[in-house]
């Protein structure tokens, strides 16, 4: 599902394709320094908006939305109007939850996103709603609360299905597969990642395909299907190596080493790690 904020992907270093947190944070902080804005000033503006009423609340809301647009937190310049108060407030809370997340304030990010959720549901904007639910799922995962994360990611998946958004579906299925693998449910994980692989073959995104294949390799390995794990990781490495994604290729070699160790080929595994 396309989102006005970058769709955060479940963070597991070996698997995720859209974990943009570090890069976005660097860009974000660079812009802040140029504009001479401090995090404390932004937090203060948000707090004053929450406490304000009437026209003062609208004025502060417009300042927040303008800030979000200037910093790239929203893709369109929005105004806080009386007739769109629910949507405007949903957008502000959702935007600020992401702001807290990229500034490593995970508890604030989650609590703010949970405030945003009922507003997003009332707004009628399914793109905004999908973004909010996705973020909540990621925040729960980052806190190690995998059960709650799965609940929200399943909701995102249903919205992706409704929107017939194959790219979004693939990302969400990758996240769900990662979560189910982490909770000891490899068969369920496999049921998500295999269709995601076929979607990426159809879409032609070689980098995302390699990520899906790498995750599938880990799942097959967990299930004891060593040859299938090897086949997936070999294809993933080939894609990353040919496209000169050195960091990703190194991850694939690490995954391949795990497969080779399971096959008893310790010497070959050691070569992968050199």
What are these regions (language model features)?
Residues 62-66, 91-102, 113, 127-142, ...:
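Conserved alpha-helical positions within TPR/SEL1-like repeat arrays
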Residues 46-49, 61-62, 69, 73-81, ...:
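Inward-facing hydrophobic residues that define packing positions of alpha-helical scaffold repeats
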Residues 37-40:
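Boundary at the C-terminal end of the N-terminal hydrophobic targeting segment
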Residues 51-52, 82-85, 119-125, 159-165, ...:
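Short coil/turn linkers that connect adjacent helices within long alpha-helical scaffolds
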Residues 76, 80-83, 100, 120, ...:
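Eukaryotic all-alpha helical interaction scaffolds
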Residues 25-34:
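Bacterial N-terminal signal peptides
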């Amino acid at each position: 599902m396309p989102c006005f904020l970058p769709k955060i992907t479940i963070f597991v270093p070996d698997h995720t394709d859209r974990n943009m947190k570090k890069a976005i944070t660097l860009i974000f902080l660079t812009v802040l320094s140029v504009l001479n804005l401090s995090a404390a000033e932004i937090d203060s503006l948000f707090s004053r908006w929450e406490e304000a009423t009437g026209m003062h609340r609208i004025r502060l809301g417009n300042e927040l939305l303008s800030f979000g647009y200037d910093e790239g937190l929203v893709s369109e310049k929005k105004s806080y109007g009386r007739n769109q108060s629910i949507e405007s407030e949903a957008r502000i809370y959702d935007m600020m939850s992401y702001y807290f997340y990229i500034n490593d304030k995970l508890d604030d990010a989650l609590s703010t996103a949970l405030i945003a959720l009922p507003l997003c549901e009332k707004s009628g904007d399914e793109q905004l709603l999908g973004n909010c639910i996705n973020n909540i799922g990621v925040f729960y995962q980052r806190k190690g609360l995998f059960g709650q994360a799965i609940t929200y990611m399943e909701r995102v998946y249903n919205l992706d299905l409704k929107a017939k958004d194959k790219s979004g579906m693939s990302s969400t299925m990758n996240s769900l597969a990662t979560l189910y693998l982490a909770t000891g449910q490899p068969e369920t994980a496999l049921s998500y990642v295999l269709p995601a692989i076929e979607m990426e073959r159809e879409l032609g995104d070689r980098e995302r395909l390699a990520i899906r294949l790498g995750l599938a390799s880990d799942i097959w390995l967990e299930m004891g299907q060593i040859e299938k794990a090897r086949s997936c990781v070999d294809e993933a490495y080939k894609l990353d190596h040919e496209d000169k994604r050195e960091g990703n290729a190194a991850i694939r070699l690490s995954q391949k080493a795990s497969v080779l160790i399971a096959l008893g080929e310790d010497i070959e595994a050691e070569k992968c790690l050199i």
